[in-house]
């Protein structure tokens, strides 16, 4: 992350943890660019399955399929790939960034907050409940979510509540759709042109 971005108190970045489908990466890049995200980071992530086995989920490579799914945005708004996501999250936190984890579960517990709920830590939030420090939104892998080590570093967890009682087989949105909704809800108001 550039020092200019670190100093920008209204900065908003996204960390994609092992998003494996090129169409999802492309759609996230397009939405991120359109909605004013400053930077997107991709990374490979290690997960532990129910048997204690380590599983590596790789981020989709930046191929023509990603470019097509982004409708060409990849050519003007390229993500930065990180080799050590835990070190990166620790670095931005040490610089005053507010790290937000997204998902429906954290360590097996259903999350109770949603995107319309104010942060329990209301220090440094504006009247709309948006954090005024620079923000890093962490988006997890399509099947495994956010790795526990990164999840434990998050300052706040959010999710999108369904608008109805849903079938158990439809437990979430597509990651690119969820990401766009979260960006729109969390983006600092000063970045949104009226």
Predicted regions and their residues:
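RNA substrate-binding interface of SAM-dependent RNA methyltransferases
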Residues: 1-120
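A short, hydrophobic secondary-structure junction motif
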Residues: 19-20, 141-145, 181-183
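Structured adenosyl-cofactor binding patch, chiefly the S-adenosyl-L-methionine
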Residues: 33-34, 62-73, 148-194
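N-terminal regions of ATP-driven nucleic-acid and macromolecular assemblies
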Residues: 51, 57, 86-87, 94-96, ...
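A generic structural signal for ordered secondary structure
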Residues: 76, 89, 132-136, 155, ...
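Active-site/ligand-binding-proximal alpha/beta "capping" segment
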Residues: 100-175
